């Protein structure tokens, strides 16, 4: 075991008396504090300096910045590897490279666990796995949200472990049964704040929200030296697992510029969720008028169906001001978010027309993640629908879009939480049909800009009437006639006459209607408190 540069100086006189003397247990109490102080020194001044030179906070600084002041109560503060002289006195202490304890984040109790990279890079030869196991099990038993701050191997194996043991071993992922169970029990958030590899990488993605501090954190199954030996690729940590690699692949939900911003994302995310599945989401006192009617919504969607519009102002106009929390950044045109309606947390599905309106494989993954999150923690789902169906083309087929899309639709149909829909524009095909479960009595409103069908009417005329157009004396004139005829029947008023949509509304009424709906939705949520009908998967 490497000797840390915070080696303990032997105390004057006996380290601890054999039993209680005239002074009581004062010597032992002093020894407890001395060992705690050695643990707080982490890997020692040299290793701490290198951590800071790399632009990363230390494990203690991270805990101090994330947790409410004075709220962190460490568990296993004396855990580590002690060296003793012949008289049984402690001469040095290498603290375990995982710091854990209960804390409060914005007043809420959590289980907070953080890797200490200054002690052997977080590798298993400086880990005491029982501490990590206890933290996950305790969180589940006490129904505490789990927050993991990851930096290094998170207790994963190393060559030095095998050398020290004198034999190899069949690997076991520490506390993995509890890690999996907690996903269906309590909110789990993980932050990538350094080179997160192996077991650490797996612990990152076993969460409801994974955050990466770009330029500070990297994520990979194996680091550059192992990759170089295994595949011949000579890559830096950033090239192998930096933000540019993971921004679109569905591994990490949110990216931040700094560690401090990552902590802000964690605080915000937890504020929408209950402490466990046995509670309801926290409802805040209304800071925004539920009857607010925004004039901008009347002109939000252009009359020209080919002209895109900005979805962010629409979200801000409908949901409580400042409450929209972007969820998965990798969804492409699929917008996933958490927000509040009259103080009530909800999940939000929408589309960014500037990035397209069809459901890609990545968008379907983002949708599945959000819907499963809402089902697990009892958040009603609101869809602002402008869905042009599944993405088409060779690239879409190569990526298995229909498989991911069907999985997303299955998540919607399996979700028991109340669902509501505002149809802003398009509802086409399988993708549009599955954005909400229309087999349920889900409340739905449509704006006058609504346009729906099995496929876009504008592009389907040529295919449906190809023979007639080929035989026409003037194909262009015949095409225009067909467009006028079909244009009349695509009016949303025709659909409303047949109750094909429940109601056409003034877009300015969207927020008042949804705020009234969400109060009804929260009345039925107590019936769903408890574990979800199916286990949550990462």
Segments predicted by a language model, with ranges:
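Ligand-binding clefts of soluble mixed alpha/beta catalytic domains
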Residues: 2-538
């Amino acid at each position: 075991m490497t000797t840390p540069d915070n080696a303990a100086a032997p105390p004057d006189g006996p380290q601890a008396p054999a039993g209680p003397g005239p002074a009581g247990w004062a010597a032992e109490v002093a020894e407890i504090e001395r060992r705690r102080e050695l643990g707080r020194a982490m890997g020692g001044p040299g290793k701490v300096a290198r951590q800071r030179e790399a632009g990363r906070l230390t494990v203690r600084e991270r805990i101090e910045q994330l947790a409410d002041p004075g709220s962190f109560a460490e568990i296993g503060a004396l855990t580590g590897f002690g060296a003793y002289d012949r008289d049984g006195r402690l001469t040095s202490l290498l603290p375990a490279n995982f710091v854990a304890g209960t804390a409060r984040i914005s007043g809420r109790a959590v289980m907070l666990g953080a890797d200490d990279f200054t002690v052997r890079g977080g590798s298993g030869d400086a880990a005491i796995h029982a501490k990590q196991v206890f933290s996950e099990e305790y969180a589940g038993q006490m129904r505490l949200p789990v927050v993991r701050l990851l930096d290094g191997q998170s207790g994963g194996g190393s060559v030095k472990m095998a050398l020290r043991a004198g034999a190899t071993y069949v690997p076991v992922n520490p506390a993995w049964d509890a890690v999996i169970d907690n996903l269906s029990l309590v909110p789990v958030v993980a932050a990538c704040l350094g080179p997160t590899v192996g077991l650490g990488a797996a612990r990152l993605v076993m969460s409801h929200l994974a955050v990466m501090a770009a330029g500070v954190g990297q994520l990979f199954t194996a680091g550059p030296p192992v990759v170089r030996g295994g595949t011949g690729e000579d890559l830096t940590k950033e090239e192998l697992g930096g933000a540019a690699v993971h921004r679109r692949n569905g591994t990490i939900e949110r990216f931040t510029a700094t560690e401090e911003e990552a902590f802000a994302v964690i605080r915000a995310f937890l504020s929408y969720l209950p402490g466990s599945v046995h509670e309801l989401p926290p409802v805040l006192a209304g800071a925004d008028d539920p009857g607010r009617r925004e004039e901008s919504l009347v002109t939000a969607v252009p009359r020209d169906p080919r002209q895109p519009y900005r979805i962010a102002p629409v979200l801000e106009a409908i949901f409580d001001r400042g409450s929209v929390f972007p969820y998965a950044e990798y969804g492409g045109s699929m917008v996933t978010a958490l927000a509040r309606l009259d103080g009530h947390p909800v999940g939000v599905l929408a589309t960014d027309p500037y990035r397209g309106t069809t459901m890609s494989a990545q968008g379907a993954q983002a949708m599945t993640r959000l819907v499963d999150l809402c089902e697990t923690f009892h958040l009603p789902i609101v869809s602002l629908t402008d869905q042009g169906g599944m993405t088409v083309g060779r690239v879409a087929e190569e990526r298995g879009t229909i498989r991911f899309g069907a999985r997303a639709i299955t998540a919607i149909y399996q979700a028991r939480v109340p669902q509501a829909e505002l149809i802003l524009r398009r509802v086409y095909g399988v993708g549009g049909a599955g954005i909400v479960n229309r087999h349920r009595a889900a409340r739905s409103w449509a704006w006058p800009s609504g346009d729906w069908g099995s496929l876009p009417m504008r592009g389907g005329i040529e295919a449906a009437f190809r023979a007639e157009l080929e035989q026409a004396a003037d194909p262009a004139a015949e095409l225009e006639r067909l467009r006028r005829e079909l244009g009349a029947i695509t009016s949303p008023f025709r659909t409303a006459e047949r109750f094909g949509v429940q109601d056409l509304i003034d877009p300015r009424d969207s927020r008042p209607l949804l705020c009234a709906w969400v109060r009804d939705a929260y009345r039925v949520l107590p019936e769903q408190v408890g574990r979800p009908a199916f286990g949550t998967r990462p």
